[in-house]
């Protein structure tokens, strides 16, 4: 029986301008012009040409900047839509708490795409909702993610740490080009591993991940297939601080309604001040904005009626969220918000298949990753996300027309029933984390 090597992917999460030189205008040897005439006759057109060239370069540069800005905005928008689609798939299998990172999943799958060709590459792009980004620029997607990673890492107030590992079996021949591109775009650290000794490999990889996530994910891997050749791991650690922290003195145990019949007691935080919010009449939901330091925001979506939160998921899109944000009004309000901690782990392989990414196992074409790429398969796509929300902030690892009405908001919003939350980086519009809380006391 032939053993097919398996590729295991786990998700935790220069531009050169070449301008031709201008050749000097030739002068006729038969009729040499006096020096002062040469200056007037030849130099003036050259100055005009140089001015035209500079104007052309400036215009091209402006067009390139505008195009890159539009591409970054489209990347953020489509990654959010991918996240909402993935939420719907997860929700079909899980009726409880949900939390994951659309950004982390897109980052890892784009990293895998560096080694993919043919139908495998096409399906990954479509599954991530990124097929519309300029297909004539093959390095565009990883370049955009690289720029986004660098922007996020420079924001020290944000408290976001992102990294990537490639655990490679010691005898497995990975193409140097793939490793170089992974390092260039995703700063991937390559670590040799002996997967034949599965228990030792599991222990070492868990040690690496535990260290990089600062103890938040001490045990990512429960078991390792000894036939594994390569494991790609992306991790994201978010330690956000509220722009206006909740005062722990006012945190009290209160009632949280899981559904019409079941209630639980939870630590309920309290804050008073100016908060941005809106009310969507179509969906009968309150949308509350809780800002972090570093230009990051948590949006909390709270349905008026118990049990309607599942129906809302069918209509979540970037356009709907943008409509909410445009109609936000800032008012003096009281906010009651539960403390919670979630720790969720998803085998995303089947979920991604349902979203059209089928040619990663079997029949994957990873020939840009290895010379044996047509005999490889992605055996697992794993994401584990941990998020904790308290008085100080958040610590996390990993088209329908909506009618918005202006009305007198209630003096208080009390989040005492199931709700959705989204954590955005506002400058880029990137959706970092997305989740649903049904029971704040359960991981």
Swiss-Prot record:
Q: What positions are marked as the site Essential for interaction with PROZ?
A: 261, 314
Post-translational modifications reported in the UniProt record: Phosphorylated by FAM20C in the extracellular medium.
- GO MF annotation terms: heparin binding; serine-type endopeptidase inhibitor activity
Q: Where is the composition biased (Basic and acidic residues)?
A: 56-66
Kindly give the CDD domains that the UniProt entry links to this protein.
Answer: serpinA10_PZI
> Main localization of the protein?
secreted
Q: Which UniProt keywords apply?
A: Blood coagulation, Glycoprotein, Hemostasis, Heparin-binding, Phosphoprotein, Protease inhibitor, Secreted, Serine protease inhibitor, Signal
User: Where is the secretion signal located?
Assistant: 1-23
Q: Where is this region: Disordered?
A: 24-66
User: Which residue ranges are recorded for the region named Heparin-binding?
Assistant: 136-153
**Which Gene Ontology cellular-component terms appear in the entry?**
extracellular space
**Task performed by this protein:** Inhibits activity of the coagulation protease factor Xa in the presence of PROZ, calcium and phospholipids. Also inhibits factor XIa in the absence of cofactors.
**What family name appears in the similarity comment?**
Belongs to the serpin family.
Q: What is this protein called?
A: Protein Z-dependent protease inhibitor
What species is given as this protein's source? Pongo abelii (Sumatran orangutan)
Lineage, opening ranks: Eukaryota, Metazoa, Chordata, Craniata, Vertebrata
């Amino acid at each position: 029986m032939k053993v097919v090597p398996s590729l295991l992917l786990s998700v935790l999460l220069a531009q050169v301008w070449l301008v031709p030189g201008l050749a000097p205008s030739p002068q006729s040897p038969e009729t040499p012009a006096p020096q002062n005439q040469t200056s007037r006759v030849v130099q003036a057109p050259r100055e005009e040409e140089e001015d035209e060239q500079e104007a052309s370069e400036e215009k091209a540069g402006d067009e390139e900047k505008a195009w890159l800005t539009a591409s970054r905005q489209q990347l953020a928008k489509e990654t959010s839509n991918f996240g909402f689609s993935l939420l719907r798939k997860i929700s079909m299998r899980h009726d409880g708490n949900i939390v994951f990172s659309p950004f982390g999943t897109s980052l890892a799958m784009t990293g895998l795409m560096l080694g993919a060709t043919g139908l495998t590459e096409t399906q990954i792009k479509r599954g991530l909702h990124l097929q519309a980004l300029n297909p004539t620029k093959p390095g565009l997607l990883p370049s955009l993610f690289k720029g986004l990673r660098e922007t996020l890492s420079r924001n020290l107030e944000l408290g976001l740490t992102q990294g990537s590992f490639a655990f490679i079996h010691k005898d497995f021949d990975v193409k140097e080009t793939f490793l170089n591109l992974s390092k260039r775009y995703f700063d991937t650290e390559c670590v040799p591993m002996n997967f034949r000794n599965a228990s030792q490999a599991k222990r070492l990889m868990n040690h690496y991940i535990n260290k990089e996530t600062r103890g938040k994910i001490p045990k990512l891997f429960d078991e390792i297939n000894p036939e594994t050749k390569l494991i790609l791991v992306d991790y994201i650690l978010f330690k956000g601080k509220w722009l206006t922290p909740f005062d722990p003195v006012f945190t009290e145990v209160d009632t949280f309604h899981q559904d019409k019949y079941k209630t639980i007691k939870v630590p309920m935080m309290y804050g008073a001040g100016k908060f941005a919010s809106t009310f969507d009449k179509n969906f009968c939901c309150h949308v509350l904005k809780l800002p972090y330091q570093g230009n990051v925001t948590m949006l909390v979506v709270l349905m008026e009626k118990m049990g309607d939160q599942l129906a809302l998921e069918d209509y979540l899109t970037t356009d709907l969220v943008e409509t909410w944000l445009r109609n936000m009004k800032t008012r003096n309000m009281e906010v009651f918000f539960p403390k919670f901690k979630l720790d969720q782990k998803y085998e995303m392989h089947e979920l991604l298949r349902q979203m059209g990414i089928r040619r990663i196992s079997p029949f994957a074409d990873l020939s840009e990753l290895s010379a044996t790429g047509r005999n490889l398969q992605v055996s697992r796509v794993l994401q584990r996300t941990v998020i904790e929300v308290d008085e100080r902030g958040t610590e996390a690892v990993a088209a329908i027309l909506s009618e918005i009405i202006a009305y007198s908001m209630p003096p208080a919003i009390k989040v005492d029933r199931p709700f959705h939350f989204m954590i955005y980086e506002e400058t880029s519009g990137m959706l970092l984390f997305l989740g649903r809380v049904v029971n704040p006391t359960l991981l």
